[in-house]
């Protein structure tokens, strides 16, 4: 059976991921007029720029949907976001600033939950607004087929008939008006925005040019921290984790993870925390550029990693970072539920996150400028008395350290011999300007 349909399947049910914007509105109306039977599915992901979710399915019915459903995905989205924090599943960083994979997390949830809802309605053909140059077309393809093995894909934006008739936003707007809908195009921004309650992505148009900076962006989850006229007073905030799970902010305990994330967004957003500018590698190996917001994710991530470094040993922390980066790439590629990702997630959540219990106090200032004021945990292996510079009882003596250093002589001797070997083969210079300026002299002395 053909998985991807190049032309509209007339007379068949088609599920469309319906946002209520111009593109999906025009596509739904066009499909209905051409003889398909469209079903509209809207994901409530807690998008910060969406004012009225209930109105979206109503509009879909007006445009010809056979049925329209609003699927609440917020709880699952936050659960996956917390899992990503527990695992450090983030691989794109620039200058220490992290992209928290908020769009890939949203696609993992949307791609599974919407297709599951379609399957309940007997809808086995799915369309969405992703373009052939982006990451989402592959993410949705993978998640959709994982959820429904019988799924077929129809995307109007891959159909030459649709493109020939309604290939641009102006044409789509004129089409809607001609069909009796007073649809006015929104004012064109200098970039495109996609969001969910974990974060916002700003990209394309002017942001494709690297001489356009964050300063052209109007944040939807935070503030223009780069604008000195914007007053942002410093603020202290405490974050508490129990067994890897964020449970309290500023002493207030949350039983609802969605409400906790919304509050974390409000706190971090007041300062512009978690905003970053990234050049990344898309799934198809081409580079793209995005400016991201994720105030709540950033706040929780900072506190989580502070506890992590105080609780776990060096090798565990190294594995957390290495496996987290690997898992972040899998998430980015639309493989969040693949076996290799589940294996990494289980290991990191079981052996790392389970021990992360404690409270971190931070002072937030402007943007990503913050200080850690206090760290408290019953699981801390950081114990200042072990390495205090003050006189007192010690867990080891000067003689113990002398013995430990003496044992290092073996590998120091081996390293010296390797350096001589590198010099003899020309891989390493023995001149005074090299990294080991005394090597030639030592060799002459027979040492």
UniProtKB/Swiss-Prot annotation:
UniProt keyword Coiled coil, yes or no: no
EC number: 6.3.4.5
The keyword Ligase belongs to this UniProt entry's keyword annotation: yes
Binding site for L-citrulline: 99, 135, 139, 192, 201, 203, 280
GO molecular function terms listed in the Swiss-Prot or TrEMBL record: argininosuccinate synthase activity; ATP binding; protein homodimerization activity
Keywords per UniProt: Amino-acid biosynthesis, Arginine biosynthesis, ATP-binding, Cytoplasm, Ligase, Nucleotide-binding
NCBIfam families: argG, PRK05370.1
Entry protein name: Argininosuccinate synthase
Annotated source species: Escherichia coli O157:H7
Organism phylogeny: Bacteria, Pseudomonadati, Pseudomonadota, Gammaproteobacteria, Enterobacterales
């Amino acid at each position: 059976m053909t998985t991807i349909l190049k032309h509209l399947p007339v007379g068949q049910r088609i599920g469309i991921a319906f946002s209520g914007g111009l593109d999906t509105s025009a596509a739904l109306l066009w499909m209905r007029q051409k003889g398909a039977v469209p079903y509209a599915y809207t994901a409530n992901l807690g998008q910060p720029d969406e004012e009225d979710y209930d109105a979206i399915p109503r509009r879909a019915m007006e445009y010809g949907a056979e049925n329209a459903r609003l699927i609440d995905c917020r709880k699952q989205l936050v659960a996956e976001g917390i899992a990503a924090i527990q695992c450090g599943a983030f691989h794109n960083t620039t200058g220490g600033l992290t992209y928290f994979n908020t769009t890939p997390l949203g696609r993992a949830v949307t791609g599974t939950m919407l297709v599951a809802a379609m399957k309940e309605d007997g809808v086995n053909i799915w369309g969405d607004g992703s373009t052939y140059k982006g990451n989402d077309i592959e993410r949705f393809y993978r998640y959709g087929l994982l959820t429904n093995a019988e799924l077929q894909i129809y995307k109007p934006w891959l159909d030459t008939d649709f493109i020939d008739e309604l290939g641009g936003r102006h044409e789509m707007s004129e089409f809607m008006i001609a069909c009796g809908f007073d649809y006015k195009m929104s004012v064109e921004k200098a970039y495109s925005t996609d969001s969910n309650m974990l974060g916002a992505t700003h990209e394309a148009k002017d942001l494709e040019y690297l001489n356009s900076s964050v300063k052209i962006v109007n944040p939807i989850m935070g503030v223009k921290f780069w604008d000195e006229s914007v007053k942002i007073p410093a603020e202290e905030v405490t974050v508490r984790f129990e067994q890897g799970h964020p449970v309290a902010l500023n002493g207030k305990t949350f039983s609802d993870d969605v409400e906790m994330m919304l509050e974390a967004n409000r706190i971090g957003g007041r300062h512009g925390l978690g905003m970053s500018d990234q050049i990344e590698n898309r799934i198809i190996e081409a580079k793209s550029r995005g400016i991201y917001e994720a105030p709540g994710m950033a706040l929780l991530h900072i506190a989580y990693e502070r506890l992590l470094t105080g609780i776990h040993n060096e090798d565990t922390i190294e594995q957390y970072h290495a496996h987290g980066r690997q898992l972040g790439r899998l998430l980015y590629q639309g493989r969040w539920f693949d076996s290799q990702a589940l294996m990494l997630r289980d290991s990191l959540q079981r052996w790392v996150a389970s021990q992360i219990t404690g409270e971190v106090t931070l002072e937030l200032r402007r943007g990503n400028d913050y200080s850690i004021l206090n760290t408290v945990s019953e699981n801390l292996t950081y114990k200042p008395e072990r390495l205090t510079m003050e006189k007192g009882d010690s867990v080891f003596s000067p003689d113990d350290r002398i013995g430990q250093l003496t044992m290092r002589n073996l590998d120091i001797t081996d390293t010296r011999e390797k350096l001589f070997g590198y010099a003899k083969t020309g891989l390493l210079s023995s001149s005074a300007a090299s990294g080991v300026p005394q090597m030639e002299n030592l060799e002459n002395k027979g040492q």
